Amino acid sequence: MARFLSPLRRGTTYTRLLHLWVPMLVVSLWMFIDPRRPWVPALLVIPVGLIAGVRTGEGVQARWMLTPGKEAPGFSIAPSGSWRDRLRTAVWLEARLLLGVAAMFMCVWMPSLVYDLVRLSLGYPSDLAAWHPSPHWSYALLTPLPLLALYGAVVGLGHLVTAAARTLLGPSAAERLAALEERTERLLERTRIARELHDSIGHALTVAVVQA
C-alpha cells in the first residue's frame, strides 16, 4: 500500500500534472472564441513548433516540471538546429496537447462523477447520468472507483508525458556529438594538468634529493 501511494508524496507527480494543464489555457481561451471547432488549437501548434526558439522554451519547461532537481534530465534547451528538430518539436506540442486534454477530462469528470454518486447515495437525483438512475445508498460503494481512476490517470499520464519529452525533446545527434567532444576535451585538459602536476612534483623531489 505504501508503494502504491508513494506518488502522492512526490513533488514530480504534481509538477507533471501542472505541465499537462499549461496548454489547456490555450484550449480554454479558444473554446470561448469558437466552441464549435475545438480542434483548431491542434492545427495552430504545428507552425508554432517550427519556430526554432520554441524548442528552448519547451525544454526548459520539461526540465523544471517533468524532472525537477535532476542534473541530467535528458532534455535539450538549445534552439532547433535543423528541420528534423523543428518537426520533433511540432510533434511534441501535439502530444503534449493530446495528453493535456486527457488529463483535463479526467480531472474534471472523475470528481464530478464522485459528487454525482454521493448525491445518488443520499437520495438525490443524478445531475450527470443520461438514463436518470434511481437514488440508492449502494452508489456510495462506487465512489472510490472514479478516484482510483483519477489517481492512475494522473500518475500514468505524468510518466507518459515525461517519456514523450525525452524522445521528442532529447538532444539531436549533432548535440550529442558536440557534448561528447566537449567531454573529451575536458578529459584531455584534466590529463594534461595531472601530467604537468606530476612533472612539477617529480622535478621538485629531484631538486630536493640533489640538494640533500
Regions found by a protein language model. Name each.
Residues 63-67, 116-127, 162-173:
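Perimembrane helix-loop junctions in membrane proteins
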Residues 184-212:
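Histidine-centered phosphotransfer motif of kinases
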